[in-house]
Amino acid sequence: MSTQTRSGGGGGGGGNSRSQKKSNSANVGGGTAHDAAPHAAANKKGDANKTDKPEKAQPKATTEQLRIAQITNSTTEDPQINEKVTLLLTMTQRSEEEVCCALNECDYDLEAAANFLIEELPQGAFAKYEKKRKRPASTAADGAAGDGEWADGNANADKRENTRNRSSNRGGGRGGTDSRGWRGRETRENERNTRESRGGGGERGGERGDDRANDNYRGQRNGGRSAPGGGGGRGGGFVSRSGRGGGRMGGRSSGPRGDRTSGSGGFGAGRSSNANEDHHEVELWDNTIAQNAEKQQPGHDDSWGDWNNEEYEGSLKDSKVFTTSNLSTQTAAAVVSGGGAAAGAASSTGSGGELSAPPGLEHHLGSMGTTGEDNSGSSGPPATPPSALSGSATTPLLQYSAAVSNPPPQMQSQGTQHSSGGGTAAGGGGSASSSFVSAASDTFTSAASAAATLVQQAQQQQQLQQTTPIKPSATLSVEQSQYFNSLASQGVSPGSTAVQPTPAGYAPSSATAYSQTSTSVGGGGGVGGSTYPSTYANVFGSTAGDQSQQQTQVRRARVKLPPPSKIPATAVEMPGDNALNNIGYLDVQFGALDFGTDDSFDSMPEKFNASVEQQQQQQDDYQSKSQQQQQSTLTAGLQSSQIGDALSAAGYAARSTAQQQQQSASSTVASNALDQLTKNDPYGQASSASSAYQNAYQSSAASKANSAYQTSAQGSYSSSSYANVQSSVANSYQQQGYGSYQPNVNSYQQQQTVAGTQPSVGGVVPGSGSASTQNIPVGGSASQNSSSGNASSAYLTSGYSTPQSAYQSSQSVYGNSSGFAGSASNASSQYASFGTSAKLKDASTASGAAHYDSVSTSSGVSSSSGSTGNGAAGAVSGQPGVNQASVSNNNNVSGSSSNSNVTAGVTSGNVAGGGVSQSGVSSGGVGVAGGSGSASSVGVNVNNNNAGSVGGAAVAAQTAAGTAAVLASLTNKNSSSSNSSGSGVGGGATTAGGVGGASTGSGVGAGSGAGSGGGGGSGSGLVPTNIQMVSQYIQTGLPYYQQPVYSYEELQMMQQRVPHVQGYYDLNYTPTSLGAGRDNLGSVAYSTMTDGRFARTDNNSSPVSNVSSTMSQQAGSSAPMLNVPYAYFYGGNVMPGGFQYGTPAIYPQQIPTANTASGGQFPKPSYSAGYGSTNYDTLSQTTQDYSKGGYSTSVNQQTKTQTVSNQPQAGTASDLTSSMYGKGHVALNKVNSYEKQSFHSGTPPPFNMANTQTAGGTSAQPYGMYLPMPAAGHHNMIHQPIHQMDGRIHSSSRRDSNSAGQRQQSSSQSKSAGKQGYSPSYWTGQN
C-alpha cells in the first residue's frame, strides 16, 4: 500500500510528515499506528523484496485503481457532490458511504443515485460489492510491485472497504502475516482501513479522502471519517464522507469540502489540514516506501498502539454520539464566542444541552455562538439575558431545550431581577413592562420562533454547512419543529406575533422574558399574566407564521429527524394539540418536568420564554433576518407595541378602560388563544369579555389572544401567588376557576409583583386603571383598592381589610367581614360575603336572600346594588355606586360590594369605567370598564371578587382571603358559570378573576352583561356552584373523590374481605389444613419427612414431641408463619383488604380457636370434641388401626409414625378409631375417602358449626367468607384468595377430615400413616 501515511491533521495524524511513517503512527496514535502497521505490513508483507518493490514501485495504477481513481476523482463536482451526498443522505437515510458509492455508480446523477439507493441498492450491498472488487484487486495485486501499487490503488478501495474492514484487523499486528504476499497487502489494507476508519482515519482521510473527490466518497468515506473527526476519524472526511463514515454521526452533511473546515467550527483545522493533506496525499503514497520501512520495524509496536487506540477510538466512533468529534471544540467555541460570561454559565447548561445537541447544531452554536455573542453584544441591554441566552442559547435549539429544561430557575431569577430592573432596562418603564410582556411572549414565542428560526437558521446553515447542520437541526429541530409546528398549527395569530417590532431590543425581550416571567409570576400586571400565555400564544401565533417557513426547512432536517428526536412527538406536540391553556401548562411542565405549582407554569414560561428568548436572541445572531421578522413578529405578538402602548405605565393607565377594551378587542383577536380560553370561558365572556376585563388585563397583556389566554393562564396562574401556590391545580384548573380568582390573586399579587416587577406598569398600574389591567384589582387597587385597601399587597390586609371594613360596615356587624376576611373561608367570604354580607348586608339589598344564595347574583344586578342591592339601581347604583362602589367596593371586597359591583357591576360597568370606587370592582371598573357590567356581575358573583377578579379588588380582597378569593373565583367561576354575574362577567371577572384572568378580560366584558343577568340567574346556583367548585377544588386537593371510588372498591373488598379477612386468614389457616396435607407434609416434612429422613423413630418421636410440646410450637410457628406472611401480604399485597386484613389478630385468634376447635394437631380432639374426642382421635387412630388391619406393614409403619407423631392421642385415637372405623376400614379407601368426602360434604358443616362454636370466627368466617366469595365483586385480590379460600375451605374441611383423609391415606398407604403423623404434627402446628 502506498505510504499514505498522510496523517489527517484532524485525524490523529498529528505529525503530518508523510515520510515519517512511524512519526505518523505516533501522531495518529492508533490511526497512524495502523498506517504504520499496514505499511509495515506492506513491507513486512513477508517479502522483503516485495517491500522493496513497493518502495521502488512507483504506484502503477492498476486498472481497478484507475477506475477507482476515475470514479473517485471528480473534483470538479465535489461541491455539488457534497450537496448531492448530503441530499441523498437525507433523502435515502442511507449511509454516506452507500450514498457516495451510489453517486459514483450513477455518475453523480442525483436522481439516478437516489433510485439506485432506494430501489436497487440493498442495505450494505454496496459495501459487499466493493469488497468483492477489492479482493479481486488484492488478489490481482499479489506481486510485491503490484502490492505497492495495489495497496496504493486500493487505498481508495480500502477506504471503501474500510468501513467494512474497519474492525477487520484492529491490531496492526496482523502485519505479522504480511509474509503472505497479497494477504499481507490485504492485511495492510485492512489495517489501513481500520486505521483510517479508526484513529488512523484522520491519517487516512487526510491521506486519502479529501484530495480526491471520489476518494472523498470512498477514502473520505473512511478516511474523511476519521481524519476530520480527528480522533473520531468518523466525522472527519468530506461532508459526504465524513458524515457517514466520519462521524457516522459526524457532520453528515458538511459544508463544501473546502468549507468543511469553516463549516465545522471545530473541524476546521483538522479538515483544512486534511484538505491540504489531500493534495499531499499523493506524496504520501510515494512515502509509502519509507513508511513501510519504518513500519516494518515498529510495526508490532505500532500494532499495539493501533490496537489500543484503534480499539478505543473504534468504540467511541462506533458509539454514535451525536456530539461530533468537533463537538467539544465547537461547544467551547460556542461557549467562548457565544457564551460570553453568562454564556459560560448558560453555556454550561446550554453546553450540556449542546452536547446532547447534534454536532451540526453545535456548529451552529459555534458560529451562532459567535454570532450570538456579537448579537448579544449588539443587543447590549439584553446582554445579560443574551449572555445567558447566548451561552445557554448558544444554539437556539439547544437554548430552547436548555431553556425548557434548565432555564426556568434562571428565567425566574432573572425574571425577578429583570422584573424591576430588567423590565426597566428592557424599555422605558412602560416600555419595560411592554418589554417584559413582549419578552415573555417573545420568550415563549421566541422559543417557538427561536425554534422556528433556529430551524430555519439551522437549515440555512445546513445549507451553508451542508455537513454538520443537518443533524443538529434534525436532532433538536425535529422535536422543536414538530412542537412548534404544532404550535404553528395552533398558532394563534401569526399576525399578532408578527406585529411586534424588534424594539424590545431582543435583549430587553430577553430581560423581559425573565422579568416578564417574574412579571408573570408577579403578575407583571396584565402583561405578566398575559405574558406567558401571550408568549405561548405567540409561540403559536408568531411561530405559526415563522414556523410555516421553518416547518418546511425543518422537514428537510426531519428526514433525519426520526432518530434524533427522542422526545415523543406527541409530547412535544401536546401543547399545540390541546387548548393552549391546560396543555400549555402541562406541556411546559412536562418539558420542564416542573410540577411545582409555581414552577410548572410560571417557571415554565420563564424558562420556556427565556429559553425562547435566548434562542430568539440567537436568532438575532443566528437568524438575524429571520429573527427580525420573528422578533418583530414575536415582539409584536408580544404586544410590544401594544404593551408599549397599553403597558407603558402612563399609556396603559392612560388608556381608558374603553381604550383598553378596544385594545382588548384587538386582544380579542387573541381570541385565538382567547377562544381556547373561551373554551374555558363558556361564558362567552372570553371574547367580548376580554375586551372588558381581559381587555384591560389582557390589553396590558396586549398579546391579543395571548393576552386573553395569558391573562387567564399566565396572569392568573403566574400572577397570583395563590395560583403559584396552587399552580399545579391552578394551572389547569385556574383558567376556569382559578384563573379567575387567581388572576384576582394574580391581579392582587400581580399588582404587587407588577409594582415591583413592572415599576412602570406596576407603578402605573397601582396608580391607574392600568393597575386594574394589572390585575384589575391592582388597577382597582389604584383607585378602588386604595380605598378598598385592595392595594395589591394590601390586598389581603388593606384591600382585604378595607373591604372587610366596608364589608363589616356595610355588613355591619355581620361576622362576614371577618368571614370575608375569612374570605380565606371561602364560603364564608364568598358565601358569607355574598350571602352573608350580601345577605345580611342584603339588608341594604332586598335581594339579600337570593343575594346570599346567588350572592344576590340572581339579584344579580339589583342585588348587586351590591351594597345598595339595587339591581337596576345597580346601574344607577353602580354610578352612585362609585361611592357605593367604594362602599360597594368595600362590599365588593366584602363581597357585599359584589352586589354593589353587580349593581356597580352594571353600573360598575359604568363605574368600572369611571368607577374609581368601582375600583374595588375597579378592576371591574377599570379592568372591566367596559366589563363593568361584568365587574358588576363579577361583583355580584364574586362580589367584586369577580369584579375584583375583573377588578381584582374583590378578588384581591378575597384573594387576600386567598382561598376565599379562589373559592370566590371558583364560586365565581361556578357562579360565573352559573352567575354570569361575577362569574359570567365574573366569568369574565370571576372567571376573569380566575379563568377570567384571561377570561376575565373577556369574561369581564361578556361578564358584565352576563354577570348581572347570568349572575342573577346563576347567582342562586352560585352557592351550589361555588360548592361544586369548592368541592371540585377541594377534590383536587382531595383526590379522595376518586379514592373513595377506589376506597369504595376498596371498601367492598374490605367488606367482603372482612369475612374474607378471617376467611382469608382462615384460608391461610385452611391452606394450613390443606397444608395439613401440605403443611403436614411440610411440617411433618420437617418432623416426619425430615425426621423420617433423619430417623423415622425420631420422626415418630418428633411428632410425639410435637404432640405435646411441638404442637404448640408448630401452631405458633406454622400458624404464625402463615399469619405473618398474610399479615404482611394483606398489608403489602392486599393493601386495601390488607387493612381489613388488619384483623390478622382475628385470624390468629381464629387460629388458636380453630386449633382449639380443630384441635391443633388435635383438630381431631376438637373434632372429637364435636364428635367425641375419642371418636375423633380414634378416627385418626382407627386409620392407623385400620391400616394395621388392612395393611399390617403400613399399619406398623403408620402406627409407628403416627403413634410417634401423635402418640398420646394417637394411641387413644387409634383404639377408639379402629373400633369405630373398623367398619369403614374394611373398605378402607372408600370408607375413608368416602368419609373424607362425606366429611367435606357432610362433616364440614357440622365441623364448621363445631368450629363456629369452638373456633367461632374460624368456621363461621369460612362460612361467611364462603358467602362473600361470590360477593367478592373485586375478585382480583379477593378472587384469588377466595378461590383459594374456596378450595381451602374445603381444605379446612379436609383439615378436619385431613386426619380422616390421612386415615384413609394411612390406611391406604404407609405414607398415609406418615401423613397422619403429618396431620397430627400439622394440627399440633395448628395448636
From Swiss-Prot:
Annotated region Disordered: the residues are: 1-65, 129-311, 335-439, 488-552, 601-638, 749-792, 851-906, 1182-1219, 1236-1256, 1287-1327
Give the protein name, as stated in the record.
Protein lingerer
Residues bearing PTM Phosphoserine:
S656
Q: What is the lineage of its organism?
A: Eukaryota, Metazoa, Ecdysozoa, Arthropoda, Hexapoda
Query: What's a GO cellular component annotated to this UniProt protein?
Result: nucleus
Annotated organism of origin: Drosophila pseudoobscura pseudoobscura
UniProt-listed PANTHER family: PROTEIN LINGERER, UBIQUITIN ASSOCIATED PROTEIN 2-LIKE/LINGERER
Q: Where in the cell is it found?
A: Cytoplasm
Q: Name one GO biological process term.
A: copulation
The residue ranges flagged as biased composition, category Gly residues, are 7-16, 226-253, 420-431
Positions with biased composition (Low complexity): 33-43, 140-156, 376-396, 507-520, 614-638, 759-770, 779-792, 854-867, 873-906, 1298-1319
Spell out the Polar residues composition-biased ranges: 488-500, 532-552, 749-758
Principal localization? Answer: cytoplasm
Q: Residues in domain UBA?
A: 80-120
Q: Which domain of life is it from?
A: Eukaryota
**Where in the sequence is Phosphothreonine found?**
T657
The entry's keywords: Behavior, Cytoplasm, Phosphoprotein
InterPro entries reported in the protein's UniProt record: TC-DDR_regulator (IPR051833), UBA-like_sf (IPR009060), UBAP2/Lig (IPR022166)
> Which residues are the signal sequence here?
none
Bias (Basic and acidic residues): 44-58, 180-198, 204-215, 1287-1297
* Role this protein plays: Acts in the nervous system to mediate the control of copulatory organs during courtship.
